[in-house]
Amino acid sequence: MSSDPRDVLLAPVISEKSYGLLDQNKYTFLVPPESNKTQIKIAVEKVFNVRVLDVNTINRQGKRKRTRRGWGQRKNTKRAIVTVAPGDRIDIFGPPVS
């Protein structure tokens, strides 16, 4: 894996569940399948300048989908749910809209 911490965090996950976890200081990111919890923690701390308390990872199996030429498969993904210290925030979704 590359030494650049920005290569570990591919994208934030935008879903109903991830929005619900924001109240608990938990942020969800897509990460490469070969990354581990230590790499994810270091990357979040360096990129966003926050203190990480906990990292939970989820390996998601790609769905089997029907195509014109038979069956295909979506790619497998890995997600990381990162808990940051109270008082720290990551503005990945922008400020709240009034």
Swiss-Prot record:
Gene3D superfamilies, alphabetized: 3.30.70.330
Annotated GO CC locations: ribonucleoprotein complex; ribosome
One GO MF term attached to the UniProt entry: rRNA binding
Gene Ontology biological process terms, A to Z: translation
SUPFAM superfamilies in the record: Ribosomal proteins S24e, L23 and L15e (SSF54189)
Record-linked Pfam families: Ribosomal_L23 (PF00276)
Assembly notes: Part of the 50S ribosomal subunit. Contacts protein L29, and trigger factor when it is bound to the ribosome.
HAMAP family per record: Ribosomal_uL23_B
Record's protein name: Large ribosomal subunit protein uL23
Organism whose genome encodes this protein: Acidothermus cellulolyticus (strain ATCC 43068 / DSM 8971 / 11B)
